[in-house]
Design a protein with these regions (language model features):
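Large intracellular
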Residues: 2-167
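Helix-termination/interfacial motifs at the ends of transmembrane alpha-helices
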Residues: 51, 55, 167-243
Length: 243
């Protein structure tokens, strides 16, 4: 006999002490907190290298907020997908539970539906949090109420369509983040180019001395660096999430 599958003890979010989402849905507060920790940890690792090229791109004054937002959104997306993967692994464990009688003469009917439902209750602690068992329990309950076996297939189909729509909607946040990441990069591009153009205009106005021109050109190149670096960061982050 297989061991009871306890959602309250096996769900990754429940283990941490947060309210777990149903099926493969995630707790966005928890995933956001984990993403914030990852972002802070990444900047902590890069801080000693802020004077090098790889560190400068993340600590540049003009693009620091955008770089942090890009990294946070990327981390949030990865944490959500990782949590969903762990939850999917838990859902797959329901396939190992034996709920169908081994008797070859068993026939599903309103009278025998109760025995299957009882096995489900012994297989897991709460069928509502397991997609497979929730779907079966819902169909069996309708079978006992309606008394028509022929309606079970239609009930399964309706419930499957509902579950599919629910799963698709659970990816809306990830889709929004994937969309927002490169947009942030392009916003950084616009800000960087605006800074560079403004500095270049200042250079033209003070073009009387070469030393002043050189000093002002540093601001121009800094703005251009911000423009291209944030675009690169946004595109690379979106690519990592898509992979």
């Amino acid at each position: 006999m297989t061991q009871m599958l306890a959602w309250s003890l096996s769900d990754p979010e429940q283990k941490i002490g947060f309210s777990g989402g149903r099926y493969t849905q995630v707790n966005y507060l928890l995933t956001g907190l984990l993403a914030g920790i990852l972002t802070a940890g990444t900047y902590g690792v890069l801080f000693p290298f802020r004077s090098y090229a790889i560190g400068q791109s993340f600590f540049r004054e003009g693009s620091l907020p955008i770089s942090m937002a890009i990294l946070f959104f990327m981390a949030w997306s990865i944490v959500i997908l990782t949590m969903k993967s762990l939850k999917l692994r838990l859902q797959r464990r329901t396939l190992d539970q034996e709920i169908i009688p081994e008797d070859v003469d068993f026939v599903l009917s309103p009278h025998t539906a109760g025995s299957i439902h009882e096995k489900i209750m012994h297989a897991v602690d709460d069928p509502r949090y397991f997609m497979l068992f929730n779907r079966i329990s819902y169909a069996l309950s309708n079978l006992q109420n309606l008394g028509r076996v022929g309606d079970v297939a239609e009930i399964f189909k309706t419930q499957a369509e509902y579950d599919e729509a629910s799963m698709e909607s659970s990816y809306l946040v990830v889709s929004a983040l994937v969309w927002a990441i490169p947009v942030l990069g392009f916003i950084g591009t616009v800000l960087g180019l605006s800074t560079a153009i403004g500095e270049f205009g200042s250079v033209l106005q003070s073009a009387s001395e070469m030393s002043i021109i050189k000093e002002k050109l540093q601001g121009v190149t800094s703005g251009l660096s911000t423009a291209f670096e944030t675009t690169l960061q946004g595109l690379m982050a979106a690519l990592v999430v898509q992979l």
